[in-house]
Amino acid sequence: MGREKKQEYALFTAWGASFIATLGSLYFSEIMKFEPCVLCWYQRIFMYPFVLWLGIAVVKKDYRIASYSLPIASIGACISLYHYVIQKVAAFSAAGAACGRVPCTGEYINWFGFVTIPFLALIGFITIAVCSFIVIKNK
């Protein structure tokens, strides 16, 4: 497979991850009526613009977006990881109890004993970061 095709597929995959993450986030808050905590809002702030930015980049085949999306996705992943640690590690849970009206330690979902909303966001951010790295590597 040629370099440009790899870039194209990686960029589309990154956009797809951001689109699915945004739809999932909106589903949980608007349909299921789960109120987001403060850290969830920060994760949304980092995730939602990717749908537009990466969507435009896919249409225009503008692979330069990867140099911006990689650091932004990495910051979002750090926020998600911190949120996940607050939920799952007892020693850190005291930090999340007073982060706003809704405690950051709350787990609206807990699939298979480890999949929570911050974990899903973390997977989305990691997917975007890895795809951005692939785009940069194949320039």
Curated annotation (Swiss-Prot):
Main location: membrane
Keywords, in A-Z order: Cell membrane, Chaperone, Disulfide bond, Electron transport, Membrane, Oxidoreductase, Redox-active center, Transmembrane, Transmembrane helix, Transport
UniProt record, GO biological process: protein folding
Cell compartments where the protein resides: Cell membrane
Free-text function comment from the UniProt entry: Required for disulfide bond formation in some proteins.
Annotated family: Belongs to the DsbB family. BdbC subfamily.
NCBIfam families from the UniProt entry: PRK03113.1
Protein name per the record: Probable disulfide formation protein C 1
Gene label: bdbC1
